[in-house]
């Protein structure tokens, strides 16, 4: 972007995030006069296919990844996808455009899906949720009124009543919350030769029109220059799965540890497994 500005040429990259879904253009144009508060996106088709299949079939991660490879949804080396690097790069682009502040992939907190188990998925179901790898880009306002940008990628609990919970397979979606426009969701194929070509062709047409009419595309303005928030300063809810000894007072000891660290427990489930118990704890914001 800096090189393009220096050379006074336009930079087009609609296909860089979510394939055929038009999200870069709306952020640069349609939403330019609004204040975006949050973006939550399913922006990687490989991981969404894997998590959707694990949820639907009950298969474990390794088995589902292998099937994704056979179907062409996963690369021979899927690291960039399953460890969240690809989604983090896209979160950086979305954050930069939405909050008019320079955000790089290194600024994005990142977790992948390789540690997700069927126990995690069952726990999500008990809470009427599903698990999605989300790219979350958020404007954070502190008590003194100062603002910062939080960008993070991690497997998140999505309530089954939320629109993003219905996005399955290799499809992508970007859910946006803005001060004036309210809630908006963009949905469609996030990868594949033809959908991606559609986005690239759209950029070529836009560039050609600007050449013919002597116009310029909207630049990547970072006038707000908001700082990057520390991940530890972001409050959200957590799902904790653990196995504990099945004896009197064990749960009390566990909750005491959370209380000593100022973390309150909203929901607790226990399942007996012989001499041990599976314990599910869902925290309040922490």
Please place each PLM-identified region on the residue numbering.
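Short, ordered loop/turn segments at secondary-structure junctions
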Residues: 1, 16-18, 270-273
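Rossmann-fold NAD(P)-binding glycine/threonine-rich loop
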Residues: 1-10
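Catalytic, metal-anchored helix/loop core of enzyme active sites in primary metabolism
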Residues: 38-40, 48-51, 67, 72-79, ...
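Substrate-binding/catalytic subdomain of NAD(P)-dependent oxidoreductase enzymes
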Residues: 64-166, 171-173
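Flexible, glycine/charged-enriched surface loops at secondary-structure junctions
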Residues: 78-81, 102-110, 132-133, 210-223, ...
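Cytosolic Rossmann-like ligand/nucleotide-binding regulatory domains
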Residues: 255, 261-280
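Conserved small/polar residues in nucleotide/adenosyl-binding loops
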Residues: 282-286
């Amino acid at each position: 972007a800096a090189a393009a500005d220096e050379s006074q040429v336009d930079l087009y990259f609609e296909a860089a995030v979510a394939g055929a879904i038009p999200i870069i253009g709306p952020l640069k144009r349609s939403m330019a006069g609004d204040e975006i508060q949050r973006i939550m996106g399913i922006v990687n088709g490989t991981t969404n296919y894997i998590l959707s299949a694990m949820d639907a079939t009950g298969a474990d991660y390794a088995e589902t990844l292998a099937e994704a490879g056979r179907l062409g949804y996963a690369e021979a080396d899927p690291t960039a996808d399953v460890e969240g690097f690809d989604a983090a790069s896209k979160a950086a682009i979305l954050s930069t455009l939405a909050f008019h502040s320079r955000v790089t992939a290194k600024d994005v907190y990142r977790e992948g899906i390789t540690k997700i188990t069927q126990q995690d998925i069952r726990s999500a179901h008990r809470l009427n949720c599903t698990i999605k790898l989300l790219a979350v880009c958020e404007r954070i306002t502190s008590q003194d009124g100062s603002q910062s940008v939080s960008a993070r990628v991690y497997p998140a609990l999505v309530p089954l009543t939320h629109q993003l919970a219905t996005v399955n397979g290799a499809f992508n979606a970007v859910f946006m919350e803005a001060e004036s426009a309210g809630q908006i969701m963009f949905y469609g194929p996030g990868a594949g030769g033809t959908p991606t070509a559609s986005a690239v062709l759209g950029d070529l047409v836009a560039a050609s029109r600007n050449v013919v009419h002597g116009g310029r595309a909207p630049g990547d303005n970072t006038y707000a220059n908001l700082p990057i928030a520390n991940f530890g300063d972001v409050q959200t809810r957590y799902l904790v799965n653990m196995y504990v000894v099945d004896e009197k007072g064990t749960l009390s000891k566990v909750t005491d540890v959370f209380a000593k660290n100022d973390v309150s427990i909203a929901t607790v489930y226990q399942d007996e497994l012989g001499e041990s118990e599976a314990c599910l704890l869902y925290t309040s914001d922490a």
